[in-house]
Amino acid sequence: MGIFTFEDESTTTVAPARLYKALVKDADTIIPKAVEAIQSVEIVEGNGGPGTIKKLTLIEGGETKYVLHKIEAIDEANLGYNYSIVGGIGLPDTIEKISFETKLFEGANGGSIGKVTIKIETKGDAQPNEEEGKAAKARGDAFFKAIENYLIGHPEY
């Protein structure tokens, strides 16, 4: 098993508490509205807390796929949320899981700084490859931007 770890940081004008609410507390309804590729988010096991598994159905390259998203930890007081992609058609065959450790911080002018550590764990002797890391980062950046744009466009939220 190989492990490829990288970190990323994004900034936004959206306040941390509001962004956290959209990304964690209301994610099941907000994400399909904000992220065009994601069609639905549904709980398949658990009560919404750590250990819960969610199925995200998405369209990628004209194909309907899904990934299984497992909640690892929720730290509302510190605006932290950890989860892993643990299965599904959207997970490459060589990947065991992709883990995300996320945290929001107060940014400039009332905005937010989002920090994430991503760990890609491969199966067997497969080696993590840089392209998978770049693709994961690009998807994460696009996801964050889509949520930001949704919140800016919906100030009543």
From Swiss-Prot:
Enzyme class label: hydrolase
Keywords tagged on the record: Allergen, Calcium, Cytoplasm, Hydrolase, Metal-binding, Nuclease, Pathogenesis-related protein, Plant defense
Residues binding trans-zeatin 2: E60
GO molecular function: abscisic acid binding; calcium ion binding; cytokinin binding; melatonin binding; protein phosphatase inhibitor activity; RNA nuclease activity; signaling receptor activity
InterPro entries associated with the record: Bet_v_I/MLP, Bet_v_I_allergen, Plant_def-hormone_signal, START-like_dom_sf
Pfam family, one: Bet_v_1
Any GO CC annotation of this UniProt entry: nucleus
Residues binding Ca(2+), per UniProt: P32, V35, I38
Binding site for trans-zeatin 1: D8, Y83
EC numbers on record: 3.1.27.-
Residues the entry annotates as binding trans-zeatin 3: H69, Y81
Subcellular location: Cytoplasm, Cytosol
Coiled coil (UniProt feature): none
Cited SUPFAM superfamilies: Bet v1-like
The keyword Calcium appears for this protein: yes
Superkingdom of this protein's organism: Eukaryota
GO BP terms: abscisic acid-activated signaling pathway; defense response
Family that this chain belongs to: Belongs to the BetVI family.
Function: Class II ribonuclease (RNase). Binds to cytokinins. Interacts with melatonin.
Protein name: Class 10 plant pathogenesis-related protein 2F
UniProt lineage: Eukaryota, Viridiplantae, Streptophyta, Embryophyta, Tracheophyta
Gene that this sequence comes from: PR10.2F
